[in-house]
Amino acid sequence: IKKLGFSFHAPYGVFKRIIDYRNWDFCQIQFNYMDTEHQAGLKGLEYAESKGVGIVVMEPVKGGTLAALPLYASDPLTAAESGKSMASWALRYVAGFDNVKVILSGMSNEEQLEDNLSTFSPYVPFTDHEKVALDAAITALKARPNNGCTGCKYCLPCASGVEIPRVFRVWNDFQRYQNEDAAAAD
């Protein structure tokens, strides 16, 4: 083994214990501009950096959700930089962190591949104007109705067999992203 690392899918407290367990070369975390407080999140990314552990990012476009934003969230981004895709905004956000060494992006066609390549050829950090636009989009997304479910699963098992945390997650995601196809698939 030349480089030792791990993929992480739990709360930050667990992440910190794993990072402190040994001298890792890298870790893989879910990270994007909407998931800065999810799992390891921004706090974990910064802690890994303080320990010299490189970051591999998965879900930079949140399973494609950030590539297909509703108009209320995409309008500030489009106005700030016409011609850049919504996926490009998500990828550039993640690339803006020095400790991010690899960004994994799931692509399903050549157009997405070309868009990702053009995003990083060359990579251009956000301008102050673009940061303001992205903050406006994030604020708009986070302002949408949310039922407050944390996914703790204390409501399970449900006597009627309903997977309550999953149903609430789908409802929250639909309220925020208005993606009927994603909601129906889940």
Predicted segments with their positions:
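Distinct, well-ordered alpha-helical segments
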Residues: 10-23, 41
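Conserved acidic residues
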Residues: 2, 25-28, 101
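Structured C-terminal cap/extension of enzyme domains
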Residues: 21-23, 42-186
